[in-house]
Amino acid sequence: MKTLIHVALLASLAAPLAWSAGTVKVYTPDSEKPKTLTHAEHLLDLVGQPRLANSWWPGAVIAERQKTAEAEQQHKALLARLTGLAEQEDGDDAAAINSVRQQLQTLKVTGRQNVNLDPDEVRVTEKGNPTLEGEYTLWLPVKPTTVTVMGLISSPGKKPFTPGRDVASYLDEQSLLSGADNSYAWVVYPDGHTQKAPVAYWNKRHIEPMPGSIIFVGFADHFWTKAYDGLNADILHSLIQRIPE
């Protein structure tokens, strides 16, 4: 009897582990409809799939369902904040804020997880192969051939990527809108990390974005009131959380 109880106890302990294994919807460039992977207990069970071997991992994004709901609410709050700020301004200032809001409205965000998805790194990095519990979505984009410029600039959008070209030169053809930071821009790389790039004549550094990066020109701290505190950081957060195209 003790043996039977012991076996039953082990079974009851094992059941939640099997139940908690991740379910992942995988979007690949060759199909509009996602494929579903079930019973993925660790990250390597997902990214180590042979069918994904040729994926462009620097731009891959994995998101968790509950975190996605949070990210969507945060992005919605950001858009509402920009709307409110624009209503408090007029003229060129209001137009600049509305331009940024319109650019951000086109973004779709998700609950991006801060994890390296390159299978080689997952295999060898300490704590690089975390467990998967719950519902996830993985996006695997085609390697882009463009860089996106956005923010308080005259002509936001995609620009052809040119090897060796630095952040400042991508902005040379732009006019800055009212209240823009004319000394620094932010680079949001496809893997989600960011870098502050000096772009003025007095502090310029040669920083090259990679294909798929976003160059963001934000609000100048000295120009705006304290109502704008943290706004650039909130915008960068949404850009990091964007769903790849």
PLM region descriptions:
Residues W19-E245:
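Ser/Thr/Pro/Gly-biased, low-complexity, turn-/loop-rich segments
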Residues A15-L17:
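N-terminal signal peptide c-region/cleavage motif recognized by signal peptidases
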Residues K2-L10:
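Sec-dependent signal peptide recognition
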Residues L10-L13, P190:
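A general, composition-driven signal for non-globular sequence regions
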